[in-house]
């Protein structure tokens, strides 16, 4: 609302800010170059464009900055996801992705809560929303510097400067996770030939391979031709519609009669539930996956349960809670239901990411994550406009937000928006259940094909001692480059 007033944009125009499309090029780049540098550049671009949005004076300027900002974010997410998959074995990837989801959700919650409350103020003489964007820009640039200085891509350790003239010890070549072993089961850094010799014997996958169109077409065809990938993407497309539709929750709470502060804290409570739910779902997927090894059934069953329980809970939230009168009296009830709702419906993302990591050889993981984000983001973004269209043209929403014709109109608008939200959440979730069911038959064979492809190509050197040594050398070299 604050951005809309400042840039003279309607709500429908502001919705286009969330429809900026990004390219899967970032995944193709991340699979061939050091992903830590790709992530650092993405954070830097993200920070600069976020500052540009905060300084925009028209919707056109904001749209251009937002589009470039989306590309910076696209550089970050697929590469970070593939790095997490490389650092963790299959039976702990769900929890690892859950931790990433937890931190992302907590950051988004804190940012949204802060921006909502600072939007009506004028810190340092500027509009509150502009100040919030500039603050995020500063944090993004600092993050870029930290990633550049300290992050290490395990896939590129075989040619990292820390290896030259050093020794490797206790390293194993694995296709799914990191390992270190030596005689007696402990890692060792002695007794092996110099790293340069090891590197010369067998380089990692495409260590210095140039980015050619033939390789791009090959990778794209492999990824898009995987049946389980197609199914998970279809599930993700329809499954992201409810999440985008939930951006209307704040408007819905305000129409119910909650103050701006109460609406913000309720949404923060919902975000906390989602953050913890991601970690819970990933952990449950890992545990059930260990009980059903070498199959996707454990993670898929966890996802199906999350989708299934979300349907009745969404009905309780949108239609079963008291409305009207003094809504402050129902603040605790709404907060409890929103927390449990978020805790229950957020299990799928972490398990889907863990499943993706097993569908392709590890040197194509950035590509598969990038295409997933591209398809889901482009089509799933329709959720927000669908809610508005359904509320206005199907369920009879009248007027504009902030201008109503009295309590009767407000109540009818609440009912219309609640019904639209319910339809745009439950119907996609029904399709999600069907798509997840298909994975029980397709995933195992697709995973077997990925392992066969992985065995045909050289695997990277991996090991925790090597990661630590490379990180130390990277920091030392950066310090040495600084002028005294």
Predicted region positions:
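Helix-loop-helix hairpin linking two adjacent transmembrane segments in secondary transporters
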Residues: 100-154
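Structural signature of the two symmetry-related core transmembrane helices
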Residues: 37-51, 297-315
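Juxtamembrane intracellular "pre-TM" segments in multi-pass secondary transporters
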Residues: 155-232, 458-463
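Conserved MFS/SLC helix-loop-helix module at the cytosolic interface between two early adjacent transmembrane helices
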Residues: 21-59
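Cytoplasmic helix-loop-helix junction between adjacent transmembrane helices
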Residues: 65-104
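Symmetry-related core transmembrane helices of the 12-TM Major Facilitator Superfamily/SLC fold
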Residues: 130-149, 310, 418-437
């Amino acid at each position: 609302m604050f951005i809309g007033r400042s840039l003279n944009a309607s709500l429908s125009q502001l919705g286009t800010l969330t429809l900026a499309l990004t390219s899967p090029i970032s995944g193709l780049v991340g699979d061939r170059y050091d992903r830590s540098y790709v992530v650092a550049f993405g954070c830097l671009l993200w920070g600069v464009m976020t500052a540009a949005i905060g300084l925009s004076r028209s919707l056109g300027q904001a749209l251009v900055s937002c589009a470039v900002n989306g590309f910076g974010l696209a550089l970050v997410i697929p590469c970070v996801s593939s790095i997490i998959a490389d650092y963790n074995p299959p039976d702990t990837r769900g929890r690892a992705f859950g931790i990433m989801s937890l931190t992302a959700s907590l950051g988004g919650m804190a940012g949204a809560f802060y921006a909502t409350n600072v939007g009506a103020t004028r810190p340092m003489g500027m509009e509150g929303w502009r100040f919030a964007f500039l603050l995020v820009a500063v944090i993004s640039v600092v993050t870029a510097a930290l990633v550049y200085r300290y992050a290490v891509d395990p896939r590129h350790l075989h040619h990292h400067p820390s290896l030259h003239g050093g020794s490797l010890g206790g390293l194993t070549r694995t296709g799914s996770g990191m390992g270190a072993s030596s005689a007696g089961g402990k890692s060792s850094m002695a007794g092996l030939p110099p790293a340069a010799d090891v590197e010369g014997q067998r380089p990692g996958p495409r260590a210095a391979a140039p980015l050619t169109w033939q390789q791009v077409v090959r990778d794209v065809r492999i990824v898009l031709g995987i049946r389980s990938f197609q199914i998970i993407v279809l599930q993700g497309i329809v499954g992201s519609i409810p999440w985008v539709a939930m951006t209307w929750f704040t408007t819905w709470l305000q129409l119910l009669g909650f103050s701006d502060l109460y609406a913000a804290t309720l949404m923060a409570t919902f975000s906390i539930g989602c953050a913890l739910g991601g970690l819970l779902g990933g952990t449950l997927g890992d545990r059930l996956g260990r009980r059903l090894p070498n199959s996707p059934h454990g993670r898929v069953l966890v996802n199906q349960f999350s989708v299934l329980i979300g349907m009745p809970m969404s009905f309780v939230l949108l239609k079963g809670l008291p409305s009207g009168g003094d809504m402050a009296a129902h603040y605790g009830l709404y907060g409890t239901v929103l927390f449990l709702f978020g805790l229950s419906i957020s299990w799928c993302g972490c398990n889907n990411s863990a499943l993706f990591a097993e569908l392709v050889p590890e040197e194509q993981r950035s590509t598969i994550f990038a295409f997933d984000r591209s398809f889901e983001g482009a089509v799933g973004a329709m959720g927000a406009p669908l809610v508005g269209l359904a509320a206005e043209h199907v369920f009879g929403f009248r007027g504009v937000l902030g201008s109503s014709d009295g309590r009767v109109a407000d109540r009818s608008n609440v009912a219309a928006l609640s019904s639209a939200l319910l339809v745009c959440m439950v119907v996609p979730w029904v399709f999600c259940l069907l798509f997840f069911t298909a994975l029980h038959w397709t995933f195992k064979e697709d995973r077997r094909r990925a392992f066969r492809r992985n065995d045909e190509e050289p695997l990277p050197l991996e090991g925790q001692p090597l990661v630590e040594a490379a990180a130390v050398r990277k920091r030392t070299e950066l310090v040495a480059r600084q002028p005294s």
